[in-house]
A protein has these predicted regions:
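Short, well-ordered alpha-helical segments enriched in acidic and aromatic residues
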Residues: 203-230
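Short beta-strand edge/turn micro-motifs at domain boundaries
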Residues: 168-170, 274-313, 319
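Surface-exposed, charged secondary-structure patches
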Residues: 132-134, 229-273
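C-terminal motif of bacterial Sec signal peptides marking the signal peptidase cleavage site
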Residues: 15-18
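Bacterial signal peptide processing site
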Residues: 20-23
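Short beta-strand elements that form the blades of beta-propeller/WD-repeat-like
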Residues: 72-76, 86, 140-149
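Surface-exposed loop and turn segments in beta-propeller and other repeat-based domains
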Residues: 107-125
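Short, low-complexity N-terminal intrinsically disordered segments enriched in polar/charged residues
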Residues: 179-202
Length: 320
């Protein structure tokens, strides 16, 4: 029960899925990492009429309508004709419709994303797709957290989508618990940080302000300043050589070791070599469970915490 409660709490805080109400608030390799979208032709953004009676569904759709800087963002869940019953309750398999403008020009118009596009080979019938109630926005990208869950359980997959100003949609699979099964907020944060940071570093034209914004969100002031000048090549957080976004498919966050404020991350590069890094964590002031990144050290496989069970799996592909 404790594990279930903690998992649901973490997912609710970050993703706000199965319990969401009808609210407004402020995705290469074996499979394609980008979602192929169906795009409706619209000269300007106009709210589409939706005659669906959502009161018959136990989970109400979430929507985001907000303006951040020169971004205008409209993302909503909608009923796309698929539903199922669980006991006496009716669940809708919601899809997403995305309309995003930047500088008054459309970047995504009528961009539709469904559960199969997000989950790929991890698609499971009668799991429901849910989105967070807010986005994180930089000069280059709009970031959206998603969950894909078995209704009324703690069995979930989590993802982060990056809607880029160049029209690309990238996807990274994240997790609500460490590889060893530790459920804590730092796991979400480390996954999300690496997804956002690598996305910013690997933009066609990396934007310094956008990179700094991600660093400031997840790192101490001193470490953020130290990392500002680094690129995707020979980066202390990533390792030697040039890091490619698709390598995040094998990205793993391990548990913090007892008595320490650090965790090991690792990923695999082409050829099978694994790279290990120890991420140093520091508690946020006046919080008990929230951590930010304060440094990074090289690590080895011998330093990994002991495994309780499970087998390592690669994350899904990263473009949609």
């Amino acid at each position: 029960m404790k594990k279930l409660a903690l998992t649901l709490s973490l997912i609710a805080i970050t993703l706000l899925t199965a319990c969401s109400g009808n609210k407004k608030a402020d995705t290469n390799g074996a499979e394609n990492d980008s979602i192929t979208a169906k795009t409706d032709s619209m000269p300007l953004y106009v709210e589409e009429e939706d005659k669906t009676d959502y009161s018959k569904f136990v989970v109400q759709p979430t929507r985001i309508d907000t303006t951040v800087g020169d971004w205008e963002i409209h993302i909503r869940e909608f009923y796309d004709g698929k539903k199922f019953k669980l006991g006496n309750q009716v669940f809708a398999n919601y899809s997403l419709k995305v309309n995003i403008f930047k500088g008054g020009k459309p970047v995504f118009k009528g961009h539709k994303i469904d559960a199969k596009a997000v989950a790929g080979s991890n698609y499971i019938k009668d799991f429901i797709l849910g989105m967070s109630e807010n986005v994180f926005v930089t000069e280059t990208t709009v970031y959206l957290n998603l969950s894909y869950c078995e209704p009324e359980t703690d069995y979930c997959q989590t993802y982060i989508l990056a809607f880029c100003a160049n029209g690309q949609v990238r996807k990274a699979q994240t997790a609500s618990e460490s590889y060893e099964g530790d459920m804590d907020g730092y796991v979400f944060d480390v996954y999300d940080f690496y997804a956002m940071y690598v996305n910013e570093l690997t933009q066609p034209q990396p934007n310094k302000a956008a990179i700094q914004k991600v660093l400031n969100k997840y790192c101490t002031k001193g470490f953020a300043q130290k990392m500002q000048s680094h690129t995707s090549n020979n980066n202390p957080l990533l390792g030697s050589g040039k890091f490619e976004f698709q390598w995040l498919r094998s990205f793993i966050v391990h548990s913090k070791e007892a008595g320490t404020n650090s965790c090991i991350i690792h990923y695999q590069i082409p050829g099978g070599k694994k790279v290990y890094k120890r991420v140093l964590l520091q508690k946020k002031p006046r919080t008990e469970y929230d951590f930010i990144i304060s440094g990074v050290l090289d690590a080895t496989e011998d330093e990994l915490p002991s495994m309780s069970d499970g087998e390592e799996e690669d994350a899904e592909d990263d473009e949609m």
